[in-house]
Amino acid sequence: SLRRFLIFYRYLTNLTDICQAVLKLFSSHLFFRFHIFNISEIESLTEKCYNKQQIKFHKTERFMHMNDFILSCCSTADLTEEHFNSRNISYICFHYELNGKEYEDDLGKSVPFDQFYLALQNGASAKTSQVNADEFEHYFESFLKEGKDILHVTLSSGISGVINSAMIAKETLEERYPERKIYIVDSLGASSGYGLFMNRLADLRDNGYTLEQLYDWAMQHRLNLHHWFFSTDLTFYIKGGRISKTAGTIGGLLGICPLLNMNDEGKLIPRQKIRTKKKVIRAIVDKMEEFADNGLEYNGKCYISQSACMDNARAVADLVEARFPNLNGKVEIHSIGTAIGSHTGPGTVALFFWGSTRTH
């Protein structure tokens, strides 16, 4: 064991690295598990730790949380896999069908986003299915077996019944693992707004919040995350019944872009019909000024989601950054994933920020 330990650290070149690594190894119990590795596996791992700081950081952070709770969500939070990994957030995938073939909503790995939206533009049919109770049970149990509690945040109940599947799995597993805790939170959000919510929860967890404290905070503040959307292509809003066929046809001819938001029940509500893309871009940023914490002095993060309309998303981001000089970093632009995108279609831009409590 001592020889293996020395091999593991032969690439570390200074005392600070060694001290930090030893503390993390002891805290994660990895030190006592070296017998499960052979020499070549340890050498391979150390090579990665030495050459790739990001991999080293990700692995050590994961090991540091070995005995803590799992922070989890669904793929419909529409962040990248790199983002989920860097924030130590686990996720489970929704499903969708494209022209009758089933895929996982796996963050664009099976079908890249550009190909997905091009297929929709060319007339492909898409439909989605939520995570079922059996899938949740298997997913949750993989953590419970390791002695970890779980805080799972679901896609809004206003647009999906996935929380019901999660609750069924929770009740089943609590009987099997009475010593463990599973908390389920309805985000009342979607897409990267849901993702921005998860990012804040990860911040609080990393700042020392307990499982119970994080659950309480999530329940108290989920309606402070604002979701505003517009679309320049009404096709899928007509298909989804959010806009009537007659109104959609006339709106398309007149260049009308509907402006919607998510209300206090997590449902999408049409708020305004705005003619021309230029005006709706200005209008959505006006909504941020109206509802964001401290108005133009807003100093939180801002995310944007877009479905095959990066130019429109970039125009919104540029206007936000010009109007809100105290933002916490640049506006982050993410792709609307394949599950959410099956309903929005191409041409949707969504703006997310923290603000006053959402109303009906």
Predicted regions and their residues:
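Mixed-charge interfacial surface used for oligomerization/domain docking
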Residues: 65-68, 76-84, 89-95, 162, ...
